[in-house]
Amino acid sequence: MANRGDLQKKTHTKKRPLHNIYGKEILSKRLEAENFPRTTLSFYRYVILENVQELRNRLYVEWEALGVLGRIYVAREGINAQLSIPSHNLNSFKENLNSRIQFKDMLLKIAVEDDHRSFLKLDLKVRNKIVADGLNDDAFDVTNVGKHLSAEEFNRCMEDKNSIVVDVRNHYESEIGHFENAILPQSDTFREELQILLELLNGKEDHKILMYCTGGIRCEKASAWLKHHGFKDVNQLHGGIISYAHEISQKGLESKFRGKNFVFDGRLQETIGNEIISVCHQCGKKSDRHINCSNPGCHILFIQCDDCSEKFEGCCTEECKTVLHLPKEKQKEIRKGKSNENRFFTKSKIRPKISELYRNRKPFETA
């Protein structure tokens, strides 16, 4: 029979939470206190995974023990990860991946630039898909992807007059950096872009299509989608812009990428070339400084130069600047849509649509 002490121990034993429980301030202080370097990297793989929730929980325990921070999506169709890890644990992390046949010999794309502050927490989620594409995967062969090209091959193919270079990223990514003469669909999401591509490339089915994205994952699905719709010569940049930057540096190749590479972490961008090709959304001055609007009810991502940052206090509009100076409780009321005062600042006004910021642009633009 168990004694009272044993019963008390069982009563007070709590299951360890398999998610972050700390706020941004605490997480930031922890990261600042680290006295070792971190390595930022990304990887993905389309592979059938079983018992996804159980796998997610095991990965969380194992990767948290290695000090991994980042954003990882797992789904029945595979894994998509952007993360940072203490550099001294990198080999252990590779061993962890190789211990599972589904993740063995994973191509890890190391960040071009790294300030060791790319992520604050470990965020590992189960999703229906590792990239939101809005497609019915049963309707076409998702494994029939385009031909993978090295940086050298991609450069050479760009010289072919029959080639069409297509950026498979969102407009806010391509705005600060893209390949020479690339077609830049003005889409807000990958789901939108896939539909736009068919319209944009209509009648070009016999051309050589050269696709690229940040790390390669979006090209996997987009290339299969185009091949399903009759495109005969579909190619994609192996490892995306990240691998391209490393290869041209290692081999001394000419870079045909202009500007910076947008990344989905705290860094927001990596320098590929020194050229600034984008402009401040507010004054039109040359700038590639991406920030989120300082108004918590907006938080829209946009480009703002230093002068406009000071003028608008980090906000995207005068309206957001006005909201920023309201009492905190009033701001909360506005965000919840409960305030009857200052009706101009409704949620739709606080969070302007991208299409409004870009209302003077055409649906499709070429670099």
UniProtKB/Swiss-Prot annotation:
What Gene3D superfamilies does its record include? 3.30.70.100, Rhodanese-like domain
Q: Which cysteines are joined by disulfide bonds?
A: none
According to its UniProt record, the EC number is: 1.14.-.-
Pfam families xrefs: Rhodanese (PF00581), Rhodanese_C (PF12368), UPF0176_N (PF17773)
Q: Report the residue ranges that make up the Rhodanese domain in this protein.
A: 159-249
Q: Which GO terms describe its molecular function?
A: oxidoreductase activity, acting on paired donors, with incorporation or reduction of molecular oxygen
Q: Which residues are named in the active-site annotation?
A: 213 (cysteine persulfide intermediate)
Q: Which reaction does it catalyse?
A: uridine(34) in tRNA + AH2 + O2 = 5-hydroxyuridine(34) in tRNA + A + H2O
Q: Name one GO biological process term.
A: tRNA modification
* Keywords from the UniProt entry: Oxidoreductase, tRNA processing
Supply the InterPro entries for this chain.
Rhodanese-like_dom, Rhodanese-like_dom_sf, Rhodanese_C, TrhO, TRHO_N
In terms of HAMAP family, this protein maps to:
TrhO (MF_00469)
Q: Name the protein family.
A: Belongs to the TrhO family.
What the protein does comes down to: Catalyzes oxygen-dependent 5-hydroxyuridine (ho5U) modification at position 34 in tRNAs.
Q: What is this protein identified as?
A: tRNA uridine(34) hydroxylase
